[in-house]
């Protein structure tokens, strides 16, 4: 497999073509951003953690019947993925009130929700990825009705599978963001699953083990990312 031209450079990843149709080469970066790009920095070895952790979790999800774009882990920072036509929506699943939900509803951060909440956000950096609903998504043509239903159902299924793993790792899955795309008419999970896209809290201390440490200047960001990977890898080593 040959790495081709860079197609796109985002906040956290670079995407390249390959010499094989329908396959992309993804490189994970150490760059970090928050508040829609207003805050910028670097988190040491973030790219390594996010690449390797995503690969581990994608493999587990595939075994449970959840289709992902993951094909192969190449090295510490790079993986091969299936080319997808991305659905321009973020699916956010919340188990505990935190971040924008706590602020929007005026509830204390850490409130355990009686059931998981699924939210949709329109992917548009210029607009700040606004919170939208199913009606908006259908009216604007961002997704077909059956795909909209499927990505929300997959979000809940992924939530259940990740919680099983993370609970064994002593980690609370507070909330997380997913992105989906389509290839040959089939919906696949894309993007990544990492401390960049999830809120992880230590089960005993409620210490934050995710990008909130960068957002809120809590320090020990690199250590938190590495700790999540270490714990998940330990749980999945067999």
UniProtKB/Swiss-Prot annotation:
Similarity remark: Belongs to the SAICAR synthetase family.
Top EC category: ligase
EC number, as in UniProt: 6.3.2.6
Keyword ATP-binding: yes
GO BP, one annotated term: cobalamin biosynthetic process
Annotated protein name in UniProt: Phosphoribosylaminoimidazole-succinocarboxamide synthase
Organism domain of life: Bacteria
Organism: Desulfitobacterium hafniense (strain Y51)
Pathway: Purine metabolism; IMP biosynthesis via de novo pathway; 5-amino-1-(5-phospho-D-ribosyl)imidazole-4-carboxamide from 5-amino-1-(5-phospho-D-ribosyl)imidazole-4-carboxylate: step 1/2
PANTHER family, sorted: MULTIFUNCTIONAL PROTEIN ADE2, SI:DKEY-6E2.2
């Amino acid at each position: 497999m040959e790495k081709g031209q860079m197609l796109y450079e985002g906040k956290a990843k670079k995407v390249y073509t390959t010499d094989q149709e329908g396959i992309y080469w993804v490189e994970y970066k150490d760059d970090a951003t928050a508040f829609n790009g207003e805050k910028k920095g670097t988190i040491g070895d973030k790219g390594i953690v996010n690449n390797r952790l995503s690969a581990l979790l994608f493999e587990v999800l595939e075994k449970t019947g959840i289709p992902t774009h993951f094909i192969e882990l190449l090295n510490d920072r790079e993986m091969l993925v299936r080319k997808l036509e991305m659905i321009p929506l973020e699916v956010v699943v919340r188990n505990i009130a935190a971040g924008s939900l706590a602020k929007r509803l005026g509830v204390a951060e850490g409130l355990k929700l009686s059931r998981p909440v699924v939210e949709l956000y329109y992917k548009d950096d210029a607009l700040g990825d606004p919170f939208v609903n199913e009606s908006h998504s259908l009216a604007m043509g961002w997704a077909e009705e059956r795909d909209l239903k499927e990505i929300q159902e997959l979000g809940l299924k992924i939530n259940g599978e990740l919680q099983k793993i993370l609970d064994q790792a002593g980690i609370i899955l507070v909330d997380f963001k997913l992105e989906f795309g389509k290839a040959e008419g089939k919906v696949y999970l894309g993007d990544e699953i990492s401390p960049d896209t999830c809120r992880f809290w230590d089960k005993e201390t409620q210490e934050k083990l995710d990008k909130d440490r960068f957002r809120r200047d809590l320090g020990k960001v690199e250590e938190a990312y590495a700790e999540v990977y270490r714990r998940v890898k330990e749980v999945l080593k067999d």
